[in-house]
């Protein structure tokens, strides 16, 4: 959830969670519906909820998270019954930029809106990113950011890479992410994270 939720991997307990205001779902869906081929996704613990036009990028998100897509007729009613850490808007990059411009104009004062990839537009509570939540986690266990190594490849990883004592970009990372990193490792397909562990943690 890009920093909106911290879960204890041993117990499954949610340590920290921040949610979107429910009243943003309807106006966001209105924006999405203006553009053919654009989808909006919400997340449960087991599935992705689709309110727009399911596309190849929604399928990509489904594959990445090992979660099926469930298409619902009334997206707003469905998602406002639950707490939502984030929405993801997916589609062709040029259309995503148009959606982004509209969303920023309407919600800039209380949402965080950015592209994690050219085809993924993240809609988050304001002030939330991976660095924010990792800093909270470090504080809870008595460590500083100097002790943290972060690996990433997308725009949504920038803040944590810049905050970490050692910020690492994958070889397949976006150019700006590479520019911001202290170290560039091998690609995801070449076990780049394992390379970092072997290089810096043994």
Language model: regions and residue ranges:
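Beta->alpha turn/N-cap motifs
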Residues: 1, 44, 170-171
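Alpha-helical substrate-recognition element adjacent to the catalytic core
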Residues: 1-23
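Short, structured coil segments at secondary-structure junctions
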Residues: 2, 10, 107-109, 163-164, ...
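A short acidic, helix-capping loop that chelates divalent metal ions and anchors anionic groups
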Residues: 7, 14-15, 120-122, 177
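Conserved strand-loop elements at the edges of beta-sheets that form or border functional pockets
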Residues: 8, 115, 187
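Conserved acidic, metal-coordinating active-site core of Asp-based
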Residues: 27, 31-34, 38-151
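Mg2+-dependent phosphoryl-transfer enzymes with acidic/Ser/Thr/Gly-rich catalytic loops
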Residues: 122-202
């Amino acid at each position: 959830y890009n920093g909106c939720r911290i879960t204890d991997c041993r117990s499954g307990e949610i340590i920290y969670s921040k949610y979107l205001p429910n009243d943003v779902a309807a106006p966001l869906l209105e924006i999405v519906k203006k553009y053919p081929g654009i989808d909006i996704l919400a997340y449960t613990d087991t599935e992705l909820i689709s309110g727009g036009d399911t596309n190849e990028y929604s399928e990509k998100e489904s594959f990445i998270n090992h979660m099926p897509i469930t298409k619902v007729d009334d997206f707003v009613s469905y998602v406002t019954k639950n707490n939502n850490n984030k929405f993801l808007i997916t589609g062709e990059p040029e259309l995503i930029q148009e959606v982004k411009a509209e969303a920023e104009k309407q919600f800039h004062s209380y949402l965080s809106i950015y592209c994690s990839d050219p085809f993924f537009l993240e809609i988050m509570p304001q002030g939330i990113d991976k660095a924010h939540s990792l800093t909270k986690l470090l504080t809870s266990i008595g460590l500083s950011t100097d002790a943290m190594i972060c690996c990433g490849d997308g725009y949504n990883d920038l803040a944590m890479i810049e905050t970490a004592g050692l910020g690492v970009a994958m070889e397949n990372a976006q150019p700006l992410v590479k520019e911001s990193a202290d170290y560039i490792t091998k690609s995801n397909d070449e076990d780049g994270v394992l390379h970092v562990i072997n290089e810096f943690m043994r």
